[in-house]
C-alpha cells in the first residue's frame, strides 16, 4: 500500500508527523518514506509493508495531509502500474525530460577511442539539434583480451567536450561501484558541464549488490538493460531493486535476446515488449537497435536492418533510442560493423521522426475509436 501525501508535506509539517505516528500504531506494519524534491515542490510517498489487507483505506485517506491511498500488488511494488495509481511515468534530469510520452535519441560511440572522434560525433549531434549521446568508457567484453575501454582516464575530456557542444546527458555503462565514484568525481572536477545516465548492461542486471549501490544514489538516473538470458519478469524485478533503494529515475532498455534463432542478427529483436513494459510499469522504455541487429546489412528496399527495427520500436511507443554511430567505423575499437556513419545521422533522425509521427497518429486513432465505442 502507498500513502501519497499532499505536496510539500515535509518532516517539519505537523500533519506529516501525525500520519507517521498513526501508522506506527498499526500492528504488523512497517513504513518506508520516499521523497522527490523538485524545484517547485516536494512529493512524499509512504510505503506500507506487512499486513496491509487489514488496513482501512478510507480511514487513512481521511487523515489531514493525505492526498490518496493506493493498494498495490506484490509485483513491482514501486515501479508497477497499480489500480487508481496516478503517479507520473517519468522524470526530468539536467533539463531533459524522460517519460512514457516522449522520445529521446542517444546516438554516439559504443566505446570512446580518442578525442578527435568524440568531438566529431558531438559536433554532428549539435548540428542536428541533439542534446543526448552515448559514450562508453567502461566496456565489459566476452573476450578478456578485447579492448576494455579507457575508463576514468577519458572522463574529464569527454565531459568537457560534451559541455562545449551542448550535450546535456551521456549514457555511460558502469560495471563496478568504483566506476560510479569515478564518474561522480570527474563531473565534480570538471564543473559538471554535462550530465550522466548510468547504464547497467545485460551482464550485470543480476549483480544485486551493484544494483543496490546504484539505487542508493539519487543524483544520476539509470538505464537498465534487459538481461539476455533471463525472463522479462526477472529483468523488471532487477529494476525494482534499484527503485526500492531510493532511485526511481530509471529507463528500462530492450536490447534483444540471446538465442540461436536470431541469425543473421546478433540477438533476437524484442521490441514487441515495448508496450508490455509500459503496461506493467511506469518506466520509460529504451530500444537498442545496434546491439539487437549487430550488422549494417541492408534490405532490398535500401533500408538498413537497424533502421527497420528502430522504426518497429518507435512505432510501438519507445521513449528512448540507444544507437551506435562512429566517424570511421573501420577504426572503431568496439562494434564497428554495426555503427552507423555520421553522414547517416540526419537521415536516421528524420526516419525516426516519421515513425514517431506514425505512432502519434495511431494513438489519436485509438482515442477516437474508444471515445466512439464508449
PLM regions and their residue ranges:
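Catalytic alpha/beta core domains of metabolic enzymes, predominantly
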Residues: 93, 206-325
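Alpha-helix-loop-beta-strand connector modules within alpha/beta enzyme cores
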Residues: 148-172, 214-221, 271-287, 316, ...
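N-terminal small/glycine-rich loop or linker at the start of catalytic domains
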Residues: 91-110, 141, 282-295
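Non-catalytic terminal accessory/regulatory regions of metabolic enzymes
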Residues: 1-106
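Active-site mouth loops of central-metabolism enzymes
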Residues: 103-120, 143-149, 169-174, 199-202, ...
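Glycine-rich, proline-tolerant flexible connector loops at the mouths of alpha/beta enzymes
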Residues: 134-152, 325-336
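N-terminal active-site wall of soluble small-molecule enzyme domains
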Residues: 140-195, 207-209
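Hydrophobic faces of well-ordered beta-strands that scaffold small-molecule active sites
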Residues: 103-109, 131-135, 169-172, 196-200, ...
Amino acid at each position: 500500500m502507498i500513502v501519497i501525501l499532499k505536496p510539500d508535506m515535509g518532516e517539519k509539517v505537523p500533519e506529516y508527523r501525525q500520519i507517521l505516528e498513526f501508522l506506527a500504531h498499526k500492528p504488523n506494519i512497517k513504513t518506508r518514506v520516499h521523497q522527490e524534491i523538485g524545484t517547485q515542490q516536494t512529493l512524499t510517498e509512504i510505503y506500507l509493508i506487512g499486513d496491509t489487507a487489514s488496513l482501512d483505506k478510507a480511514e487513512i485517506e481521511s487523515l489531514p495531509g493525505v492526498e490518496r491511498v493506493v493498494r498495490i500488488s506484490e509485483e513491482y511494488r514501486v515501479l508497477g502500474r497499480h489500480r487508481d495509481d496516478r503517479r507520473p511515468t517519468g522524470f526530468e534530469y539536467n533539463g531533459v525530460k524522460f517519460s512514457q510520452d516522449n522520445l529521446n535519441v542517444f546516438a554516439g560511440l559504443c566505446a570512446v577511442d580518442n578525442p578527435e572522434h568524440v568531438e566529431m560525433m558531438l559536433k554532428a549531434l549539435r548540428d542536428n539539434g541533439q542534446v543526448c549521446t552515448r559514450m562508453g568508457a567502461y566496456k565489459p567484453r566476452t573476450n578478456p583480451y578485447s579492448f576494455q575501454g579507457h575508463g576514468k582516464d577519458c572522463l574529464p575530456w569527454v565531459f568537457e567536450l560534451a559541455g562545449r557542444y551542448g550535450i546535456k546527458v551521456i549514457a555511460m555503462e558502469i560495471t563496478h561501484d568504483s566506476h560510479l565514484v569515478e564518474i561522480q568525481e570527474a563531473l565534480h572536477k570538471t564543473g559538471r558541464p554535462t550530465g550522466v545516465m548510468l547504464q547497467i548492461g545485460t551482464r550485470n542486471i543480476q549483480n544485486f549488490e551493484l544494483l543496490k549501490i546504484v539505487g542508493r544514489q539519487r543524483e544520476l538516473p539509470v538505464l537498465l538493460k534487459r538481461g539476455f538470458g533471463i525472463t522479462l519478469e526477472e529483468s523488471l524485478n532487477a529494476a525494482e531493486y534499484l527503485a526500492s533503494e531510493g532511485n526511481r529515475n530509471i529507463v528500462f532498455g530492450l536490447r534483444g535476446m540471446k538465442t540461436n534463432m536470431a541469425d543473421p542478427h546478433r540477438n533476437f529483436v524484442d521490441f514487441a515488449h515495448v508496450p508490455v513494459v509500459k503496461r506493467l510499469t511506469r518506466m520509460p522504455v529504451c530500444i537498442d537497435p545496434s546491439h539487437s541487429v549487430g550488422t549494417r546489412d541492408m534490405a532490398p528496399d535500401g533500408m538498413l536492418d537497424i533502421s527497420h527495427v528502430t522504426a518497429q520500436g518507435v512505432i510501438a511507443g519507445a521513449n528512448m533510442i540507444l544507437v551506435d554511430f562512429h566517424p570511421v567505423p573501420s577504426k572503431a575499437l568496439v562494434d564497428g560493423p554495426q555503427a552507423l556513419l555520421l553522414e547517416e545521422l540526419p537521415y536516421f533522425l528524420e526516419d525516426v521522426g516519421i515513425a514517431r509521427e506514425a505512432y502519434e497518429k495511431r494513438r489519436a486513432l485509438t482515442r477516437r475509436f474508444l471515445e466512439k465505442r464508449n
